[in-house]
Amino acid sequence: LARVAQTQTLKLGYREDAQPFSFKGADGKPAGYSVSLCQKVAASLQSQLQLSKLDVQWVPVTAGSRMQAVTDGSVDVECGSTTRTLGREQQVDFSNTIWVEGASFVTLASASMNRVADLNGKRVGVIAGTTTDSALKSLSARGVVPVFVPIQTHTEGIAAVRTGKVDAYATDRLILVGEVLGRPSDVALKLSEDYLSIEPYALMMRRDADLRLAVNRALAQTYRSGEIIEVFRQSFPAGARPSALVEATYVLNALSE
């Protein structure tokens, strides 16, 4: 936080392919739910630090590079779709929860795959090192053993399903919704109703208690004021409503000063 104050610069990491949380919009600029929250955070930090100006620099990261980008200082805060885990907290800090999601999988609409058990023996694309990767590997305890196919990006994963390279692609459910709805194709896909895991999303940042507190103060204000509802409406399709878990997240993290 001291570096941000001294340089009057905030480096925010974003994903180019994690719709609807963090992606490159049609105008080439960062967009999405997490990006909007980080814009709220940036405005709050400028006020908290009493800066006349704050230069916000957006830095693209991937699922594979985001942790390193945070730990080596390339970005101060990562505004993506990152799941908070105790293992990751050994290396980085996290904000309070901003979303609660679950991992699922997508297949061709014509495929006879609907339940988690149907993944047994099937080629399943997944980004290595993610929480979805861990969830899939844990299925062996239930007698479900997929054939893992390494994928680099969500866009690549969806394309692999459509071209038949994999039988299914697994990642966080809402990202799959964004990818399927946001990228029309002649090849119809379907999303499983089963969940592989429950994923609490948070903003990832360098190990800095002062920065974490400042970010959480910004988020709490956004929740308390009701501004989070407008962020939600701008980020998701018309008529969409937060799940009960997400609504609880807003209430529980609307902390008072």
What positions do the PLM features span?
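Short beta-strand-centered segments that line the small-molecule binding cleft or hinge
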Residues: R66-S81, R88-G102
